[in-house]
UniProtKB/Swiss-Prot annotation:
The lineage of its organism: Bacteria, Bacillati, Cyanobacteriota, Cyanophyceae, Synechococcales. InterPro entries: DNA_methylase_N6_adenine_CS, HemK-like, RF_glutamine_MTase_cyano, RF_methyltr_PrmC, SAM-dependent_MTases_sf, Small_mtfrase_dom. S-adenosyl-L-methionine binds at residues 134-138, 157, 186, 203. SUPFAM superfamilies: S-adenosyl-L-methionine-dependent methyltransferases (SSF53335). Belongs to the protein N5-glutamine methyltransferase family. PrmC subfamily. This is Release factor glutamine methyltransferase. It is an enzyme of class 2 (transferase).
């Protein structure tokens, strides 16, 4: 929706100041262009070349709100994704508010791992139940629904506000009839699925409490603490998932979580020590960081 126009001359003056604000505060100037692509009719190339001084610029947000929004990004470290109200994740446009964690690019690999590990699945197994525990924005649930067109995906979160966003994302991306939403803690709302689930995927809170204060201000000040705080050692939620998942997964069912740097060996050892898992694997992200751990329940 058009919210008015601004002259190229006025815009160019403000843009130069906004770039200097970014540089002075250690913010990538590309974030300014990203915001302006969402809030004006300017495209990436035009912004990169700064080829806008001699034209009128159409606005999708009011000129006052654009200026105020950028000040908020710089001064309050408020994430651009929250300002825009959306982010790109895999092939999806995901709505985000500060009720949900912003889906990270590295988390996209969690779906690649699922696809690789299940490329040889029979059609009957592909039609089974899949679960995204701690769904947040619903991004992983969308990835699972796209990967397994015949499956029913269950998205669980303890936050009603997060589930409302996840439901909206399912509708926006045409998966409203393929994903069921459940409010509660981890497996709690899925008692009716004991022994029936083909796979569980989760990006649980995994930051040790002592390290929360060291997170970037964009994260610790604005993203939900519930999605970050992993307890004293960061593995509080992961340990629950290890302990409880065999009750719900089928024999040979798939288990996959995202974790932080340095946690993979501990998670693998916890899986081994439980005696309930086989085929335990550690997977690296694109930066070669051990980011994911997968396993299967005993057959």
């Amino acid at each position: 929706m058009n919210k008015g126009f601004v002259s190229g001359e006025e815009f160019a003056r403000w843009y130069a100041t906004a770039r200097q604000m970014a540089i002075a505060h250690g913010i990538e100037t590309g974030e300014l262009n990203w915001l302006l692509q969402g809030w004006t009719d300017l495209d990436r190339l035009t912004l990169r070349l700064q080829d806008f001084a001699h034209r009128e610029i159409a606005l999708q947000e009011t000129w006052e709100n654009i200026q105020r929004g950028w000040r908020r990004r710089v001064e309050e470290k408020y994430p651009v994704q929250y300002l825009l109200g959306q982010t790109q994740w895999r092939d999806f446009v995901i709505k985000v508010t500060d009720d949900v964690l912003i889906p990270r690019p590295e988390t996209e690999l969690i779906i690649d791992i699922v696809q690789h590990e299940h490329s040889a699945l029979s059609p009957s197994n592909c039609a089974d139940h899949w679960v995204d525990l701690g769904t947040g924005s619903g991004a992983i649930a969308l990835g699972l629904a796209a990967t397994f067109p015949q499956a029913l995906v269950h998205a669980v979160d303890c936050s009603g506000s997060a589930l409302a966003i996840a439901r909206e994302n399912a509708q926006l991306n045409q998966f409203g009839d393929r994903i069921q939403f459940h409010q509660g803690y981890w497996w709690e709302p899925l008692e009716h699925l004991k022994g029936q689930v083909q796979g569980m995927v989760s990006n649980p809170p995994y930051i040790p409490q002592r390290e929360l204060a060291q997170l970037q201000p964009e994260v610790i000040k604005h993203e939900p603490l519930l999605a970050l705080d992993g307890g004293p050692d960061g593995l509080q939620a992961v340990e629950q998932l290890i302990r409880r998942s065999p009750t719900y997964l089928k024999p040979g069912g798939f288990w996959l979580v995202e974790i932080m740097t340095g946690q993979a060996p501990m998670v693998a050892e916890l899986l081994r020590a439980s005696g309930a898992y086989q085929d335990i694997q550690i997977h690296r992200d694109l930066a070669s960081i051990e980011r994911f751990v997968s396993a299967r329940t005993l057959s």
